[in-house]
Amino acid sequence: MIEAHPAPIVRMAELEIEADQLEAYRPLLAEEIEASVAMEPGVLMLNAVALRDDPAQIRILEVYASQKDYEAHLQTPHFLKYKSLTSGMVKALRLVEVDPVLLRTKMG
């Protein structure tokens, strides 16, 4: 009998960071992403990029193994620390639900 695996949860977080806070924000984001990927088996991928012409516009492609893993991620100490420390830095946040067309990662 083949077990069905839940579909991954994929979303794009669109953030606008206060321009004068960008230098302080980036290491906090990096710390949160590193901890999430290293410590949470259900966090399959977190990739952050900045728009070239507007570096205060950050986009994060998030991939979680399941909805349960996403919800667990939101309760982790490292995510709660990130949210607390960056709350005054984030000018706007929009979570966009997306459907994966093709997700591939080259390891190594």
Residue ranges with predicted function:
Residues 21, 56, 78:
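Short phosphate-engaging motifs
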Residues 4, 31-44, 63-96:
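An amphipathic, aromatic/His-enriched active-site/gating alpha helix that lines ligand/cofactor pockets
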Residues 8-16, 45-74:
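Short, well-ordered beta-strand segments in beta-rich or mixed alpha/beta enzyme
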Residues 5-39, 44, 48:
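N-terminal first-folded block
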Residues 1-8, 47-56, 83-108:
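Glycine-rich beta-strand-turn "strand-cap" elements at beta-sheet edges
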